[in-house]
Amino acid sequence: MIPNHILILGSPNSGKLRIANLISRNEEIPQLEDAESHSGLIIKTSLRTKYYFLKLNILIDEYLESKETPDESKLSELHKWYQEFKSEEFGELREVLDGLMFTINMKTDSISFIGEALEIIEQIKLSLGDEESFHNWGGFIAVVGSCPVNQVVEDDVVLEIEDMVLSHGLEFINLSTEGENEYKEKQGKDRIVELVESHDWTNLEMVKVDSKQYEANKLAKIESMKHKLINEKEELDLDDIFKKLNLARDHASSLTQNEKDKYANKIIDEIIDFL
């Protein structure tokens, strides 16, 4: 089977291996010393859900070698990385990528640096795909904010970073969280897994579904929805649904048409699950 590819890009100590661990479920991850560079690391793994099976290569790269680097130097190195990435030499890699995760250290990266880095990430996004799909790349991009173990980032800093990322039309994921938020949306570690598993992958094998089991599951879902609709003790929280729709509409306004279609299907599925 032809493998799919995602790229995790970031500076040292920004959560790249933690993300790879989540995606691969801690399989095939080499034991690395803190001092070792992660540039060029390739983790070969696989994903299996109840719907599909696929092979996945997780590519990890760094744009500088030192953890203690001034913002100007970090931006310069990130820009150099982008210039190399968009060259003809890396054309084949750009064509096969299904996803990109850019990692930041919310404790050590300044707000100024993050803002400038997001401008470069936007340029990287525009370079992805082949000539026929120019500006309409079907992959996913997420900016993942991490924090060193046993350290805490203030809530107002996290919110400021999230607002900056969203203003660039990108998704922000806080690696320090997990579970669901107040709108029943996956967040943090669970959102990373959901983002990967719900993607429309280029190369996969569909899992054969037993027709009788499928019908049984569908009937059970219908009965559950019917029960909630008629049982006064389990009222539906319509306010939560409307809030979710409004947030989804705001987020979709910055997406391409292809991204809007995929995002709309995802939201519909989430609302059905919520019901």
From Swiss-Prot:
Keywords of the record: Chromosomal rearrangement
Single GO BP term: vesicle-mediated transport
UniProt key word Protease: no
> One MF term from GO for this chain?
protein-macromolecule adaptor activity
Out of the domains of life, which is the source?
Eukaryota
Against Pfam families, the record matches this protein to: Adaptin_binding (PF10199)
Q: Which InterPro entries match?
A: Irc6 (IPR034627)
What job does the chain carry out?
Answer: Involved in gross chromosomal rearrangements (GCRs) and telomere healing.
Q: Which family does the record assign?
A: Belongs to the IRC6 family.
Query: Which protein is depicted?
Result: Increased recombination centers protein 6
State the species of origin: Candida dubliniensis (strain CD36 / ATCC MYA-646 / CBS 7987 / NCPF 3949 / NRRL Y-17841)
> Its encoding gene is what?
IRC6
